[in-house]
From Swiss-Prot:
<keyword id="KW-0808">Transferase</keyword>
<dbReference type="InterPro" id="IPR016181">
    <property type="entry name" value="Acyl_CoA_acyltransferase"/>
</dbReference>
<dbReference type="InterPro" id="IPR042203">
    <property type="entry name" value="Leu/Phe-tRNA_Trfase_C"/>
</dbReference>
<dbReference type="GO" id="GO:0005737">
    <property type="term" value="C:cytoplasm"/>
</dbReference>
<dbReference type="InterPro" id="IPR004616">
    <property type="entry name" value="Leu/Phe-tRNA_Trfase"/>
</dbReference>
<keyword id="KW-0963">Cytoplasm</keyword>
<comment type="similarity">
    <text>Belongs to the L/F-transferase family.</text>
</comment>
<dbReference type="GO" id="GO:0008914">
    <property type="term" value="F:leucyl-tRNA--protein transferase activity"/>
</dbReference>
<dbReference type="GO" id="GO:0030163">
    <property type="term" value="P:protein catabolic process"/>
</dbReference>
<dbReference type="Pfam" id="PF03588">
    <property type="entry name" value="Leu_Phe_trans"/>
</dbReference>
<comment type="function">
    <text>Functions in the N-end rule pathway of protein degradation where it conjugates Leu, Phe and, less efficiently, Met from aminoacyl-tRNAs to the N-termini of proteins containing an N-terminal arginine or lysine.</text>
</comment>
<protein>
    <recommendedName>
        <fullName>Leucyl/phenylalanyl-tRNA--protein transferase</fullName>
        <ecNumber>2.3.2.6</ecNumber>
    </recommendedName>
</protein>
<dbReference type="InterPro" id="IPR042221">
    <property type="entry name" value="Leu/Phe-tRNA_Trfase_N"/>
</dbReference>
<keyword id="KW-0012">Acyltransferase</keyword>
Amino acid sequence: MVPWLGPDDPFPSIERALGPATGAPGLLAASADLLPSRLIDAYLRGIFPWYSDGQPVLWWSPDPRMILVPAEFKVSPSLRKTLKRVLREPDWEVRVDHDFPGVMRACAQAPRRGQRGTWITAEIIDAYTSLYRSGNAHSIETWHDGRRVGGLYGVSFGRMFFGESMYADVTDASKIALATLVAHLREQGLEMIDCQQNTSHLASLGGREIARKAFVAHVRSAVAEPPIPWQFDKRVLAALTSPAETAAPSGTER
């Protein structure tokens, strides 16, 4: 049985999450609320919410866990060419936290292969916007000719970034945002981005799975560190445009 959490109930041990032989591997608990305080507690423990409209709030801690080490980010020759163009041409911008709610809404509306509807519900948008207002959630946005054309958002505590979702209205717009984030996190010495679940798109960019135990141990250490600055722009991409950065073709985004 998946535990039901009342408003004051703590999360169970992550070891109680459903295993791979079940229909919902990684499912840890369910609740009726998505209060900011519970959401913060979840991230500090390596837990995240994922559910659809009409369902209770479902809390997950999968094993293994998909991560992206910034130092292992792969840049294909075509993406490197795109990044050089972004650096060179002034009509391309990367903005941070300029339109966080708009990025979330765009991620919610983006079509996903094999998915109907969206898990980014109005309740999710409200909860993460609250984290954004407190400085614990951020959007990295690709702009072209004054229009937001792609981006991503996620949660940050200490020296840990938890990626949530991305979208692109034009080719490579989400990759430009991710590459800019990775370049900034490299500069800051961050060792890990949480990607939650394995996808071919993330794997093509250098993502890999690690054991949940190792992931949670890293989270506990990283979130206890002082927070990093969140002021940067596309100029950080210069570090990713050398021929040493290589990658395979991409697949599906979350």
